[in-house]
Swiss-Prot record:
Palmitoyltransferase specific for casein kinase 1. Disulfide bonds: none annotated. Gene3D superfamilies: Ankyrin repeat-containing domain (1.25.40.20). Its EC number is 2.3.1.225. It catalyses: L-cysteinyl-[protein] + hexadecanoyl-CoA = S-hexadecanoyl-L-cysteinyl-[protein] + CoA. Residues 1-15 have a biased composition (Polar residues). Residues 1-59 are annotated as: Disordered. Keywords: Acyltransferase, ANK repeat, Endosome, Golgi apparatus, Lipoprotein, Membrane, Palmitate, Repeat, Transferase, Transmembrane, Transmembrane helix. InterPro entries: Ankyrin_rpt, Ankyrin_rpt-contain_sf, Palmitoyltrfase_DHHC. Residues 454-504 form the DHHC domain. ANK repeats lie at residues 57-87, 92-121, 126-155, 159-188, 197-226, 230-259, 292-322. This is Palmitoyltransferase AKR1.
Amino acid sequence: MEDNSEQASVSSQASMRPLVSDNGDREAGAGVEVNIANDNDTSVGVDGENGNEDDDPILSKYHNACQRGDLEVVREMIHGGQVNVSSDADREGVTGLHWAAINNRLNVVDFLVREGANVESKAGALEATPLHWAARYGFVYVVDYLLQHGASATTTDKQGFNLLHLSVNSSNIMLVVYVLFFVVSKGIIDIDYVDPKGRTALLWAAYQGDSLTVAALIKFNASVKIADEGGFTPLHWGTVKGQPHVLKYLIQDGADFFQKTNDNKDCFVIAEEMSNTHSFQEALRHNNFDKNGYPINKLVKRDDHAKIITFLIPLLVLGFAFFGFSHLHILFALPVIILLLLASNKFIKSFLLPSYETKGTNSASLLKSPLIAGILFGSIFWLAFVWILRILPYTFTKRPLGNLTFCAILCFVCYSLFLLAFSDPGHIGSENDHEKIRETISNLLKEGKFDTRSFCLETWVRKPLRSKYSYLNDALILRFDHYCPWIYNDVGLKNHKLFIFFILALELGIFSFVKVCLKYFDELDMDGDCFILGDDDLCSGLIGDRFTFLIMTWACIQAVWIFSLVIVQLFQITKGLTNSELNALIREGRRVDIDSQTHNEFFNTVPEGFINNKDTEEEAAPPVRNNTNERISTTFSGNLPKPRTCMGMICAVTGLHQCVAIIKDTFGIARHGSSRSTNTRSLLSSISTDYGWRRNWCDFWLLSDTNTPLWKRIFFSPPSTKALLNGKEADYATLYEVPNKNHGSVSQLQELQDPLSEIDDMV
């Protein structure tokens, strides 16, 4: 039975594979050879050239020129009468337009179409049009051009594939998005159109393990219920592939994992046969199903209630820990506290996190829960508790100023923590108007910037520079700095300044608390020998009030990472970059052996020679070599991401890895500890928003409204999406180009210096 089942699965997978030949469907199953005319040219050809050199050398030369994008040769041959564009096909029907389309030669495509080339001519064993050839390799700009010049999106090849199927098969998410909005949204092609074997675009995307395409198709209401001729639904094929994100999306959209194929197999059987049980069960857990597919009963029914409980648990655990270590022997207290921590961790992970609402494929985690914010709140609570009930009565008469100072800082910290937790970091929400989205895509295509750097796949809006999508807020965060677990919110344009005041107040508050604590311990006047603590105030505190002593020690430990955070934040302000941008620079510095010409993580298929007058040399998108042996892919490994180690989580929470990176860069230490070579570029040398420390600080601390009083400009956060950048007001919601740091005008310098003069006068 097992052998028959495995054989059935193998045969089902074999039937699933499309008939694809990398020579553009010219000969089914024929091999591809990449023609390299020179080091900078990569073209798709067959058998070294175009396969017909012996038949017609002139036609062969013409087709080779179309492949290479040699517009001058193509123009000369057509205008010279050597080739007639209306009859330039070889014996297989392949035209110059086919070769130009499959090699992403938009300039040649444009010329041939203007000369009268037939955009609907079919070629090869699959009878594919130039549009099909371009779509199979994800060339968005060629597809857009051909559609605008008469190519039909509904035409199918011999396999029964239309433009939507071929776009999905290309695994270029940008082409899929383009087809969805310009073809499917207009009703030209049905989202659930099936090929002759009953397979929809969603079914193909699931089989390919293409999570981005699956998510996009589901947003367009693609059916997860339709089964092909073998009884396989998208979830069945997704289980065959085992890509976790694909499975999560499909189950989240209501796919039936109990449904059986014609071979009487459900997803559980297929997952076991394909060794994808772990990924499948992870997807089930993500959507609140147990390993058998039955709903998990939630201990807490509401998401907000579960988060409140998570937030309050550290308050109780910290109090119990301080009490235990101060009243019990350490050999008894330590194992009890460890067991309490383990039990709390197990309770949160098993009963509270499953009650959280999940968004997309992001599962709830401790780092993305209110737990860390609860630790900060609990620490502040117990610190305030001992100050009010124990320290204040002893020290107020002798240290009134110190106590009043601490009280003021404590009130500000509590108030700002509340504001930060519920603040708007500055966001752009999702766009639902398809007409506006089409306009955005069209503008990006004209500028040669239609890729994931400039277009947000989650919100369907153009990405402003320095923005980043946040799953927590389900929006693009303007001038995104980082997600801070200590406030359970993102830090961005509108709350970044308050965040800086908050962490500065925390550090000053701890320093002030330690001072009044030491005075309190001095008032206790307890004598004793405390080994390394000696017989001073610390020893008096340890003997006389261990509970308060432990809280002061805990506060000092927190002061270490807060100081690290303050240093990193002030350094970033000085350099004119955000935490997110610093992380990106660190990641870029760790990359090795990546060919920038072939590595295309942003799915950019802008043709070589694409002219965009708006682009500066610095901002222009890098050219992408059109090597069709290296398909653009939005698929990911079937393996789940590695969980954070304990040290990794500590570094993520405290930002210590950034301090290390800054120190290494400052002292010129290379990655492996050796001196930085002259060929190694500094991490911080390519910051496009670094206009000098003086200007950077003014850009950050001053509001852009010059009519506002100076003290408000310094202490208030931006009320809108506008802020200073290089001394001029910039709207971060529409920030698509940064001011050139080398061409500041006199008016910009004057506007920058005026506030500084006011500050000097005040001092």
